[in-house]
Design a protein with these regions (language model features):
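Beta-strand elements of repeat-based all-beta scaffolds
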Residues: 1-12, 16-33, 37-54, 58-75, ...
Length: 185
């Protein structure tokens, strides 16, 4: 760790040594993986990444709107991924590097209620009065449901095939146990 408490080196017998370098503002300006491959990033005065250059020289550029929302990523091969936001600053539409479009709609409480792709597939979501997601329905009609305790902690999720994962918490709300449908913790 450095004097600011940030990780500067991680060593692992399987993955080698990873190195982290930060700029004066605390942004991760250089990351070197265990194989010695480095990614170097440049940031604006707000700490938003403007570009990153990988170990083979590919440059990825990032653009933002006046509110700081990421609006476009342009990859080294010239392809791009763009995002558009509604008047509330919520992601409304994104177009991936292959031209596929996904649109998003929200309720008055800013909860995502649907996501649709350009092939007509739609995912829908429901919530309780506190904003906890109660269900998620995929385009094929399969639904996953969620339950919560009085503190708002997720206690179970049950998928469309009836498989249930459960979660337990201590009095402080810290997750103490997570068990999947097969009983693995």
């Amino acid at each position: 760790y450095d004097s600011m408490g940030r990780v500067i080196e991680e060593s692992n017998k399987d993955f080698g040594t990873k190195l982290y370098e930060y700029d004066k503002a605390g942004n991760l300006k250089k990351y070197t993986d265990g194989n010695g491959n480095a990614t170097v990033s440049k940031f604006d005065s707000l700490g938003q990444v403007l570009q990153s250059k990988d170990a083979v020289g590919n440059i990825t550029k990032y653009e933002y709107d006046a509110l700081g929302n990421e609006t476009k990523i342009t990859y080294g091969d010239g392809s791009s991924h763009s995002k558009e936001y509604d008047n509330c600053g919520r992601l409304a539409k994104e177009t991936d590097e292959l031209g596929a479009v996904t649109t998003y709609t929200y309720d008055a409480a800013d909860n995502l209620v649907s996501k649709s792709d350009d092939s007509g597939r739609t995912w829908t979501y429901t919530y309780d009065n506190t904003g906890n997601r109660l269900s998620e329905t995929n385009p094929e009609g399969g639904t996953t449901t969620y339950t919560y305790d009085k503190a708002g902690n997720l206690v179970s999720s049950t998928d469309e095939e009836g498989r249930t994962d459960t979660y337990a918490y201590d009095k402080a709300g810290n997750l103490t146990t997570s068990k999947d449908a097969l009983g693995y913790t």
